[in-house]
Amino acid sequence: MASKSTELRPIVKLKSTAGTGYTYVTRKNRRNDPDRMVLRKYDPVVRKHVDFREER
C-alpha cells in the first residue's frame, strides 16, 4: 500500500484569496497537475466567487 506522501492523488486544502480564511478540501492528480492548484469557487463569507489557491 502506498504511503501518504507518495500517493498519486493527495488531499489538498484550497484557501480563499479574499482573506476570509474559508477553505475547501479536494484531491488532485499529481501526474496531471504538478503545480499548485488554483480554482475559482464560491466564498460564502464575502458572497462572491474568488480564486482559491492550494496551500501546503
From Swiss-Prot:
GO molecular function, one term: structural constituent of ribosome
Any GO CC annotation of this UniProt entry: cytosolic large ribosomal subunit
Superkingdom of origin: Bacteria
Gene3D superfamilies: Ribosomal protein L33 (2.20.28.120)
The keyword Ribosomal protein is annotated on this UniProt entry: yes
Alphabetical keyword list: Ribonucleoprotein, Ribosomal protein
GO terms for biological process, alphabetical: translation
Keyword Hydrolase part of the UniProt annotation: no
InterPro entries: Ribosomal_bL33, Ribosomal_bL33_CS, Ribosomal_bL33_sf, Ribosomal_zn-bd
Pfam families on file: Ribosomal_L33 (PF00471)
HAMAP family: Ribosomal_bL33 (MF_00294)
Record PANTHER family: 54S RIBOSOMAL PROTEIN L39, MITOCHONDRIAL, LARGE RIBOSOMAL SUBUNIT PROTEIN BL33M
Sequence similarity: Belongs to the bacterial ribosomal protein bL33 family.
Protein name (record): Large ribosomal subunit protein bL33A
Species this protein is from: Nocardia farcinica (strain IFM 10152)
